[in-house]
């Protein structure tokens, strides 16, 4: 007689109930809400560090440039308003990406032009030709001549446009017009000797957010570690279009790193992060520019 084994019925696991599913979704939403700000902050910090690395490379390049320069000048700009960075490329900083802050969408086209065709439109306070200031480099990159914020095609909302992300502070006590036709007394070019021995000339009164900040620098000896050389580009921009102008040389939300602050290269070659609250004071000692105003923005 055959024995017929009873078939075992395998029970399938019960599915999630609607309530359990909603609880899981709620937990995922809470975790995302907690993690996303942290990830955003980590991204911002990483961009800031990468930008600082860019400036460190430019700081090292400026020291080598000065060592090889006949006047031991720390930059190759023609006056205090000039932000041209061609004097660094390619001899001292060979990578064009170094001139773009990773917190922006600025761009630089690698299209070398002959220096022989360069037309000087700014006042030249150096006594040197453009080719001499480029240390006999025969070409230049047009997009390295100015910061992206100054370009006519710049979009402040997306931080997009051709040009560099960094300004140059090649002269101390900069308070004169930089037009080619100007005949006023030139400012003092930052050389290795000037950075080590300069005596401040002015008492500065800065209007900052409704307060007057006074910096009595006159007679004090400057230091290479406090004098600015290169910094996060920060010119005044009208944004939104037709709206208020942002502040010049003061971190606003549309600037490279927003209102947090900015990276700065000093005349001794080191670079550091400077918080927004410290910006006016470091700007005073770093540039000795007489005119400085900060208004609420936006």
Walk through the language-model features, giving the residues of each.
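Amphipathic alpha-helical segments typified by the pilin-like N-terminal helix
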Residues: 4, 10-53
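Short, well-structured segments within or immediately adjacent to enzyme catalytic domains
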Residues: 49-298
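Generic hydrophobic-segment detector
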Residues: 5, 16-22, 32, 60, ...
């Amino acid at each position: 007689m055959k024995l017929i084994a009873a078939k075992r019925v395998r029970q399938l696991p019960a599915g999630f109930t609607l309530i359990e599913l909603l609880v899981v979704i709620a937990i995922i939403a809470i975790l995302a809400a907690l993690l996303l700000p942290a990830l955003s902050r980590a991204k911002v910090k990483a961009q800031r560090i990468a930008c600082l690395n860019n400036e460190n490379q430019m700081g090292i390049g400026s020291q080598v440039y000065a060592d090889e320069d006949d006047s031991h000048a720390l930059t190759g700009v023609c006056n205090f308003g000039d932000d041209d960075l061609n004097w660094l490329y390619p001899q001292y900083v060979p990578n064009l990406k170094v001139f773009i802050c990773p917190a922006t969408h600025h761009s630089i086209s690698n299209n070398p032009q002959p220096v022989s065709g360069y037309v000087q439109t700014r006042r030249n306070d150096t006594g040197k030709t453009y080719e001499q200031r480029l240390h006999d480099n025969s070409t230049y990159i047009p997009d390295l001549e100015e910061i992206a914020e100054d370009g006519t095609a710049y979009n402040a909302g997306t931080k997009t446009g051709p040009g560099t992300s960094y300004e140059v502070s090649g002269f101390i006590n900069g308070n004169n017009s930089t037009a080619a036709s100007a005949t006023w007394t030139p400012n003092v070019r930052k050389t290795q000797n000037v950075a080590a021995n300069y005596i401040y000339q002015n008492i500065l009164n800065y209007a900052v957010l409704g307060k007057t900040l006074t910096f009595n620098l006159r007679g004090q000896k400057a230091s290479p570690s406090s004098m600015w050389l290169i910094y996060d580009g920060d010119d005044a921009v009208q944004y939104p279009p037709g709206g208020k102008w942002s502040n010049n040389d003061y971190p606003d939300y549309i600037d490279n790193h927003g209102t947090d602050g900015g990276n700065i290269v000093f005349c001794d070659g080191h670079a550091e992060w400077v918080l927004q609250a410290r910006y006016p004071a470091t700007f005073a000692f770093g540039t000795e520019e007489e005119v400085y105003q900060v208004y609420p923005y936006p």
